[in-house]
């Protein structure tokens, strides 16, 4: 996973480079392939500085918690076999992704900086708000699936991907994951023009690298979960042996879409971000959820 995260940073820089008519990293190694390793070495051998006024334990614990949670979410994911086949796999994913808010809040509070605290409060409000729609979307999918276990989703989608009947949910989930992972155009927590670097402004060296790894691991996990929920995960009728490769290709395509959006769109204003959720996404997801509750009840009289 960490290797995938390392090369995702390289792919991002390459894609953004080509979109802006330049090469991207091309000095370290052939075609710049060793750039992530060089970045990691540079960050981890630097001295981890911290402000004198910061709260030392919380300051150090926040990045460790962020990375630990980002790697813990992978436990119940079927790829094609999960590490632990949990009965309530989806609830586990939802609860662990909700806990990631604490690492951001701790880092902003412990830094003892106005910029960091403002960025952290924005991040918390944004993440908690979008968690609501993500939870309702997961509930709707579970109503179709009939179980909270992630592995049963492959059986559900054996004949048709769930993206076909539930495409509004897929679109709202994709945009919500952009906001959940603090990516452009919703990267208000790291608004360079106004907050320098957001909640991690006081971090350097190793702890900063841990936040960086956690952010990109979250991007991959969110896209992997979207693939499992809507795109039949690893199911390919004519090539069942290539299950993991198929799953990885779909995840990579969604991740590339993340990067494409980053290169194309400017940053949202904060009130627009909240209006988009509370006035647009929440009604859409609630109505769709009610529809999936009513449909089986309405059709239950048919023998």
UniProtKB/Swiss-Prot annotation:
<comment type="subunit">
    <text>Core subunit of respiratory chain NADH dehydrogenase (Complex I) which is composed of 45 different subunits.</text>
</comment>
<keyword id="KW-0496">Mitochondrion</keyword>
<comment type="similarity">
    <text>Belongs to the complex I subunit 1 family.</text>
</comment>
<feature type="transmembrane region" description="Helical">
    <location>
        <begin position="88"/>
        <end position="108"/>
    </location>
</feature>
<dbReference type="GO" id="GO:0006120">
    <property type="term" value="P:mitochondrial electron transport, NADH to ubiquinone"/>
</dbReference>
<feature type="transmembrane region" description="Helical">
    <location>
        <begin position="219"/>
        <end position="239"/>
    </location>
</feature>
<dbReference type="InterPro" id="IPR018086">
    <property type="entry name" value="NADH_UbQ_OxRdtase_su1_CS"/>
</dbReference>
<keyword id="KW-0812">Transmembrane</keyword>
<dbReference type="GO" id="GO:0008137">
    <property type="term" value="F:NADH dehydrogenase (ubiquinone) activity"/>
</dbReference>
<keyword id="KW-0679">Respiratory chain</keyword>
<keyword id="KW-0249">Electron transport</keyword>
<dbReference type="GO" id="GO:0032981">
    <property type="term" value="P:mitochondrial respiratory chain complex I assembly"/>
</dbReference>
<keyword id="KW-0830">Ubiquinone</keyword>
<protein>
    <recommendedName>
        <fullName>NADH-ubiquinone oxidoreductase chain 1</fullName>
        <ecNumber>7.1.1.2</ecNumber>
    </recommendedName>
</protein>
<dbReference type="GO" id="GO:0005743">
    <property type="term" value="C:mitochondrial inner membrane"/>
</dbReference>
<keyword id="KW-1278">Translocase</keyword>
<keyword id="KW-0999">Mitochondrion inner membrane</keyword>
<feature type="transmembrane region" description="Helical">
    <location>
        <begin position="282"/>
        <end position="302"/>
    </location>
</feature>
<keyword id="KW-0472">Membrane</keyword>
<feature type="transmembrane region" description="Helical">
    <location>
        <begin position="132"/>
        <end position="152"/>
    </location>
</feature>
<keyword id="KW-0520">NAD</keyword>
<comment type="function">
    <text>Core subunit of the mitochondrial membrane respiratory chain NADH dehydrogenase (Complex I) which catalyzes electron transfer from NADH through the respiratory chain, using ubiquinone as an electron acceptor. Essential for the catalytic activity and assembly of complex I.</text>
</comment>
<dbReference type="Pfam" id="PF00146">
    <property type="entry name" value="NADHdh"/>
</dbReference>
<feature type="transmembrane region" description="Helical">
    <location>
        <begin position="241"/>
        <end position="261"/>
    </location>
</feature>
<keyword id="KW-1133">Transmembrane helix</keyword>
<feature type="transmembrane region" description="Helical">
    <location>
        <begin position="56"/>
        <end position="76"/>
    </location>
</feature>
<feature type="transmembrane region" description="Helical">
    <location>
        <begin position="159"/>
        <end position="179"/>
    </location>
</feature>
<keyword id="KW-0813">Transport</keyword>
<dbReference type="InterPro" id="IPR001694">
    <property type="entry name" value="NADH_UbQ_OxRdtase_su1/FPO"/>
</dbReference>
């Amino acid at each position: 996973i960490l290797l995938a995260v390392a090369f995702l940073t390289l792919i991002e820089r390459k894609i953004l480079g080509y979109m802006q008519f330049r090469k991207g990293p091309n000095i370290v190694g052939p075609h710049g392939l060793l750039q992530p390793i060089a970045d990691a070495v540079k960050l981890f051998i630097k001295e981890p500085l911290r402000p004198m006024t910061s709260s030392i334990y919380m300051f150090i614990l926040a990045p460790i918690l962020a990375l630990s949670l980002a790697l813990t979410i992978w436990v119940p994911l079927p790829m094609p076999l999960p590490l632990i086949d949990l009965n309530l796999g989806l609830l586990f994913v939802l609860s662990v992704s909700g806990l990631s808010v604490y690492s951001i809040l701790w880092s902003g509070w412990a830094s003892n900086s106005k910029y960091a605290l403002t960025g952290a409060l924005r991040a918390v409000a944004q993440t908690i708000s979008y968690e609501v729609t993500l939870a309702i979307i997961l509930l709707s999918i579970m109503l179709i699936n009939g179980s909270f276990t992630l592995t049963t989703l492959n059986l559900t989608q054996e004949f048709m991907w769930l993206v076909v009947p539930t495409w509004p949910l897929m679109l709202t989930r994709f945009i919500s994951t952009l906001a959940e992972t603090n990516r452009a155009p919703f990267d208000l927590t790291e608004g360079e023009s106004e907050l320098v670097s957001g909640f991690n402004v006081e971090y350097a060296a190793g702890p900063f690298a841990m936040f960086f790894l956690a952010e990109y691991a979250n991007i991959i996990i969110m896209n992997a979960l979207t693939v499992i929920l809507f795109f039949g995960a690893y199911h390919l009728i004519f090539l069942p042996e290539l299950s993991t490769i198929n799953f990885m290709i779909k995840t990579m395509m969604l991740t590339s879409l993340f990067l494409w959006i980053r290169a194309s769109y400017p940053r949202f204003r904060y009130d627009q971000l909240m209006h988009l959720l509370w006035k647009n996404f929440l009604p859409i997801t609630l109505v769709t959820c009610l529809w999936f509750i009513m449909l089986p009840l309405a059709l239950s009289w048919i023998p």
